[in-house]
């Protein structure tokens, strides 16, 4: 059974992709050297590094944790609708890639009980420390913080039923390497979910480099070496694709 990728965008867009083993050898190494492009003139909100025609955005640092936890987020993004659309079930092992301070991780923790776990992955230890403190404060025992890197998630191969990235993928400095790694972490039949602000809609009040079109997500995620196959796009959120 193939692994699946679910793309979720606020005004949701869901894509399911199947992950294959990346090709190895000299040809792939040569391609890697040409994978990214640096431009001197670029969007000030981006890092000047481009991948498949898209500029990579600056990462939201620990100083932005309060924005992730803002009281108006449910009203603006309807996170409860997102969680419902994920169709989580008891016993699922779910990876929250770029978990930040754990807002999404905490929302997913209850629907997968009993027996389920959330693997909360982030590159910033300060975010993981904050998440851990929230879990202890609220008595949440099935969320496990994992320190990742710019090129590796820290997840074991074939270990998760679903991996989700909420407003995160567009900030990856090495998106190709991260997708290759995450696709390997999916169990057979597993799902990879992208949630991104809709670049198709100019009315979405987010900086342009922090948006993605559904077409761009599919272009990047459906490369043959990942073995991911698009499943569906779900339109339920006010601002994002799922």
What is each of the regions a protein language model found here?
Residues 191-218:
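Conserved class I S-adenosyl-L-methionine
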Residues 28-95:
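Class I SAM-dependent transferase core
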Residues 153-162:
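A short acidic, Gly/Pro-enriched loop at the edge of an enzyme's catalytic core
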Residues 227-239:
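Conserved S-adenosyl-L-methionine
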Residues 109, 176-191:
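A short glycine-rich, Lys/Arg-flanked "PGG" loop and its adjoining helix->strand segment in the class I
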Residues 161-176:
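A short SAM/SAH-binding and catalytic strip from SAM-dependent methyltransferases
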Residues 95, 99-152:
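Class I SAM-dependent methyltransferase SAM/SAH-binding core
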Residues 7-15:
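Bacterial N-terminal signal peptides
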């Amino acid at each position: 059974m193939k692994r699946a990728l679910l793309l979720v965008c606020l005004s949701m867009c869901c894509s399911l992709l199947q992950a294959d083993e990346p090709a190895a050898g000299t040809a792939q190494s040569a391609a890697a050297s040409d994978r990214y492009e640096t431009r001197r003139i670029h969007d000030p909100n981006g890092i000047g590094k481009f991948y498949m025609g898209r500029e990579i955005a600056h990462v939201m640092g620990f100083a932005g944790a309060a924005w992730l936890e803002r009281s108006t987020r449910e009203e603006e993004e309807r996170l409860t609708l997102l969680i419902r659309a994920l169709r989580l079930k008891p016993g699922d092992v779910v990876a929250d890639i770029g978990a930040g301070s754990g807002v999404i991780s905490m929302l997913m923790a209850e629907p997968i009980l009993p027996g389920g776990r959330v693997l909360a992955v982030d590159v910033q230890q300060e975010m993981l420390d904050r998440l851990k403190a929230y879990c202890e404060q609220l008595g949440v025992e099935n969320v496990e913080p994992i320190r990742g890197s710019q090129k590796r998630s820290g997840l074991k191969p074939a270990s998760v039923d679903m991996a989700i990235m909420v407003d995160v993928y567009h900030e990856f400095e090495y998106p190709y390497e991260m997708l290759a790694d995450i696709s390997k972490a999916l169990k057979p039949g597993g799902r990879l979910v992208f949630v991104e602000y809709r670049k198709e809609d100019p009315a979405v009040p987010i900086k342009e480099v922090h948006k993605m079109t559904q077409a761009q997500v599919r272009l990047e995620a459906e490369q043959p070496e990942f073995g991911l196959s698009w499943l569906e796009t779900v339109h339920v959120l006010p601002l994002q694709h799922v």
